A protein has these predicted regions:
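Bacterial Sec-dependent N-terminal signal peptides
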Residues: 22-46, 666
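Bacterial N-terminal signal peptides that target proteins for export
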Residues: 4-16
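Acidic/polar surface patches and capping/hinge elements
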Residues: 42-666
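General secretory precursor processing signal
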Residues: 7-10, 31, 117
Length: 666
């Protein structure tokens, strides 16, 4: 009988609506005397095609990036938001793929269980996937950004997308047992929300620090306050007190900002493992550190010369921000990019960074490997290029923060007409939704691990920023010659044409004899020289070192967390290597990516640039390396913070992609 029914089913599938005559029944083992039976095959289900243009996952990623731009500047928290929402969308998508495995849905993570129940899958899965994805993303955005300063705009954008997709904003059902995609999306969102309340981020208390306290009182920065008289420890982070301070998202903060996320190493990571972790106890708190890079150079340690060299290099590179100094650079991939290796010790840094002229030992490329043509030269003033880099990669006020910036780059890569969306560069070309879901999941996990690792290190080592160190060393004097005035072993090292002593005939001493013997720097002159940033430039010249400023907005100056290791370097190298892994090539589509900069219509800190230019990168790593250097020109990081971040980012990308692949292959 079973054989008979199988044959009957096969025949119906082949012929559709038929009359089962005795001959057909006989062929299936039926009796010839049976009367004719009419059986109607249901019409084939019409499968919904992929939508043209952006996938639903991409639409929600754009809403999330908008939300980040309108929230407080919290790169750690937004890396987590990007990961959790990308992962929730992946879970909602994978439920409808019988052989796929989700990340949190149906699993247990760090003691939190998100149980799952089986239900009958529809034949036409795409509409259900889109609906579940949308409700999952919508509910988490709704929860995570409810107290954002831009919450009205954020929720208006999220509501508008839901309504444009034809979804009911008020359906909060969680019972998906009968196959409701709405309930499934809500349930997955609920899992991530509950998981986020106990993952170590301290979300219930608005991510507040539980133990960390700064050892240094705030450095007051204003036109009338000079030097750094309040610092107690030149190795440790110092808060900044700035009138009218705004965070990286442009939100005004009336009090001296606290250290953002020094305890972030406690947060449940993605692919980081206990094998990568070291625990350090300070002031009764256990700092969890992944990929520990070791102690940075300290002012009174065996590496004191590296300490002074690194921070003095930051002040010297500040002199490169002058469009009128006559220095011209080829900024094309013909001359920039293609770094083969990094220094492996602090003592080797001086061989990697070009202290006087700026930049690194990159060699560029002979040919574009895609077109087999040489890259065209692009000659521009160094002072324009360095300022553009400092602002392009700043991810400062009103930006999507560094992890979000790399999602923007990912989206640009995905949009490129020459990209073949083959996962890891092999196999079938994926549809837009599957590509976006998988790439967001991979990038989200990688950015989250970068935040957990970098900020765990920041909290543990609590390292000083350039604006604090340079001003503090300037107050002490010069450390080069005991026979010269103002000698102090921990002062700034003298460098002719860059770091010098103020003499009696110096213009800085004209009418101000109290400045004789102080340290002066040839550097960007600071925001006091810019009244109208649309039309004026501070320029580069000799200033008192006690008045040195980073190339930043006067009401922002420096991010409110420790420098070592650089978050930008960690995020960027991890993202770049991840992009190489998921696309299967080190190169951007077409062998180069570009960003157009229009003369006198790009810079925000001051007027410029004086010429139009195109930022160009041959490979993902070239973009990452450029981002790292930009933070030195911007006065935010010394080399000490940079290279360890790059090395750690590369390790994170490897582990993250391995975990992603193992999940996809299950």
């Amino acid at each position: 009988m079973v054989k008979y029914m199988m044959c009957l089913k096969k025949t119906i599938n082949q012929l559709g609506a038929i009359i089962l005559t005795s001959s057909i029944l006989a062929g299936c083992g039926g009796g010839s005397a049976s009367p004719p039976v009419v059986v109607t095959q249901p019409p084939p289900v019409s499968l919904t095609p992929e939508r043209e243009g952006q996938s639903v996952a991409r639409m929600w990623n754009e809403v999330l990036l908008l939300a980040i731009r309108n929230d407080f500047a919290r790169p750690t928290i937004h890396a987590r938001n990007l990961f959790h929402i990308s992962s929730a969308m992946f879970d909602a998508w994978s439920v409808y793929k019988p052989r796929a495995k989700g990340f949190l849905f149906g699993n247990e993570l760090a003691g939190f269980a998100c149980s799952s129940s089986d239900f009958d899958l529809p034949i036409d899965i795409l509409p259900h996937q889109e609906q579940a994805i949308s409700y999952a993303a919508y509910r988490i955005i709704q929860h995570r950004f409810i107290f954002s300063p831009g919450s009205v705009q954020i929720m208006a954008a999220a509501d508008a997308l839901m309504l444009s997709l034809g979804y009911n904003l008020d359906d909060e059902s969680l019972d998906y047992a009968q196959g409701s995609a709405v309930a499934l999306g809500n349930y997955i969102a609920d899992c991530y929300i509950e998981f986020g309340l106990q993952d170590g981020a301290n979300e219930p208390k608005f991510y507040a620090n539980t133990s960390y306290q700064p050892v240094n009182p705030p450095l007051v920065l204003s036109s009338s306050d000079v030097g750094n008289p309040s610092i107690l420890n030149l190795d440790r982070w110092q808060p900044l007190s700035i009138e009218g301070f705004v965070d990286q998202a442009g939100n005004r903060i009336d009090e001296a900002p606290t250290f953002l996320s020094p305890e972030w190493g406690q947060v449940v990571p993605f692919a980081l493992s206990d094998n990568d972790k070291t625990v350090f106890t300070r002031d009764g708190f256990d700092y969890q550190v992944y990929h520990d890079p070791g102690m940075p150079p300290l002012i009174d340690s065996a590496l004191s010369e590296q300490y002074k060299w690194g921070f003095s290099l930051v002040s010297m590179w500040s002199s490169h921000l002058d469009q009128n100094d006559g220095v011209m650079w080829d900024i094309s991939p013909k001359s920039i990019g293609n770094i083969s290796e990094f220094p492996q010790s602090f003592e080797e840094f001086s061989e990697f960074y070009k202290q006087l002229e700026g930049g690194d030992p990159s060699t560029g490329y002979g040919l574009n490997p895609i077109t087999n043509q040489p890259y065209a030269e692009q000659i521009v003033p160094r002072g324009d290029y360095t300022r553009v880099l400092a602002e392009f990669w700043a991810d400062g006020p009103e930006s999507e923060t560094p992890p979000g910036h790399w999602f923007v780059i990912l989206n640009a890569v995905s949009d490129h007409p020459l990209l073949e969306k083959r996962w890891a560069g092999v196999g079938d070309i994926l549809g837009p939704l599957e590509w976006d879901i998988k790439s967001y999941f991979a990038m989200g996990g990688t950015m989250h691990d970068s935040a957990v690792a970098a900020w765990g290190i920041k909290g543990r080592y609590d390292y000083v920023r350039p604006v604090s160190a340079i001003r503090a060393m300037a107050d002490l004097g010069q450390s080069s010659d005991p026979l010269l005035p103002s000698y102090h072993i921990n002062g700034l090292p003298l460098m002719e044409n860059y770091i010098e002593l103020v003499t009696a005939t110096d213009p800085l001493a004209n009418g101000n004899p109290q400045h004789i013997g102080k340290i002066k720097l040839y550097a960007w002159k600071g925001p006091d020289y810019v009244i109208d940033p649309l039309t004026e430039q501070a320029g580069v010249g000799w200033i008192l070192a006690e008045q040195w400023w980073p190339y930043q907005r006067p009401n922002f100056v420096t991010p409110s967390f420790a420098g070592y290791v650089s978050g930008h370097s960690t995020y960027s190298r991890a993202a770049a290597d991840l992009l190489e892994s998921i696309t299967g090539t080190a190169y951007f589509p077409g062998g180069m990516s570009e960003f157009e900069v229009v003369a006198n219509n790009f810079l925000v800190f001051e007027a410029g640039p004086s010429v139009s230019m195109t930022l160009q990168w041959a490979t993902y790593q070239d973009a990452s390396d450029q981002c790292s250097l930009s933070r030195i020109w911007g006065g935010i990081h010394p080399p000490t913070d940079d290279i360890p971040g790059r090395i750690i980012g590369a390790k994170i990308a490897i582990d993250s992609f391995e975990l992603v692949q193992s999940i996809f292959e299950q």
